[in-house]
Regions:
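Cofactor-/ligand-binding subdomain signature composed of acidic, glycine-rich
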Residues: 1-40
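Gly-rich Lys/Arg/Thr-decorated short loops/hinges at beta-loop-alpha junctions or inter-strand turns
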Residues: 29-37, 97-108, 261
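Short, amphipathic alpha-helical interaction segments embedded in low-complexity terminal/linker regions
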Residues: 32, 212-299
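Short, basic, glycine/proline-bearing loop/turn elements
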Residues: 33-43, 109, 134-137
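A short, well-structured juxtamembrane/interface segment
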Residues: 43-58
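A generic structural signal for well-ordered alpha-helical segments
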Residues: 58-59, 154
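Glycine-rich phosphate-binding loops that contact phosphosugars or nucleotide phosphates
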Residues: 66-203, 210-216
């Protein structure tokens, strides 16, 4: 399929005169188009759930979440990977974002990088990809060579491959074990896939990474117990998490956080079971980091 035939390159009939709209009309028109995104993502719920279950299994075995993409898609992958570290307390090497053209491409376009089929393979080789890993290929157009090459190499290694596109029958879907196609329709500004397509990809990545982390026990009830209290805001959040999940006062939560060496999960277990820090850590390790499982077994 030629690029001009992709739905992401079609002109949107609802925005043909956006250049003559009032500012308020522009805002309302863009918002109206954005409302289509959640519905398009929702139509892919079964595929997204499949992706979460499969990726969670690999991650539990010690694998990594590796995102590959170009342009906006690549930047969204890098963003998702980066956010998992402070949010869930995982090691930086467990979530990696690769963008065609490298770090420079995060801030400016690197001409020709996305069209290099072998570049994606080279980038993955440098990570020493294994069958335990999950590679998530992102391409709004569904055809970016950098992503295709990455997925092909990942398949050869035996890694789990997931493709996220915003067109039907995407090329990258045929190069992945699981294909997710959120068809959001023509963009407000023709071909500007940083808009609806980018929003859809971000929503899907939110679901996948959050789901995988939940299944690793990084969430207790609905709070992020893996949060790293590295600044004042996060220390306050950690104390509130401990307080609201255990019922202790804020001052008691602060003391528990200190006694647990700033480990929210350990602090909760110490409070709820009366165990020492060392015992709490051992229980948590045996339960593969699942706080709920520890508390259930030690009522």
């Amino acid at each position: 399929m030629n690029i001009k035939d992709l739905i992401t390159e079609e002109r949107n009939p609802n925005t043909m005169n956006i250049d003559s709209m009032s500012t308020l009309e522009m805002v309302r028109t863009i918002n109206h188009e954005d409302q289509k995104v959640a519905a398009a993502v929702g139509q892919q719920d079964q595929q997204i759930a499949r992706a979460i279950d499969a990726a969670a299994k690999r991650y539990q075995q010690g694998g990594r979440l590796i995102y590959v993409g170009a342009g906006t898609s690549g930047r969204l992958g890098v963003l998702d990977a980066a956010e998992l570290v402070p949010t869930y307390g995982i090691k930086p090497e467990r979530a990696v974002g690769l963008i065609a053209g490298g770090k420079k491409a995060m801030l400016q376009a690197v001409e020709g990088a996305e069209d290099d089929l072998e570049l994606g393979q080279q980038d993955l080789r440098q990570l020493h990809l294994s069958a335990k890993d999950t590679v998530i290929g992102l391409a709004a157009s569904g055809r970016t060579p950098y992503v295709v090459g990455s997925l092909d190499f990942a398949n050869e290694v035996g890694a789990l491959t997931i493709a996220i596109a915003c067109v039907p029958n995407a090329v990258i879907s045929s190069h992945a074990e699981i294909g997710i196609e959120a068809v959001v329709g023509p963009e407000v500004i023709t071909g500007s896939t940083r808009m609806k397509a980018g929003t859809a990809q971000k929503m899907i990545l939110n679901m996948i990474s959050t789901g995988v982390m939940i299944k690793q026990g990084k969430v207790y009830q609905n709070v992020m117990i893996g949060v790293q209290p590295t600044n004042a805001k996060l220390i306050d959040r950690a104390c509130r998490i401990i307080s609201t999940t255990t019922g202790v006062s804020t001052s008691e939560a602060m003391t528990a956080l200190h006694n647990s060496a700033n480990d929210v999960s350990v602090a909760i277990i110490m409070i709820e079971t009366g165990r020492s820090k060392a015992d709490a850590r051992n229980l948590l390790a045996k339960a593969h980091g699942n706080v709920a499982a520890v508390l259930q077994a030690n009522k």
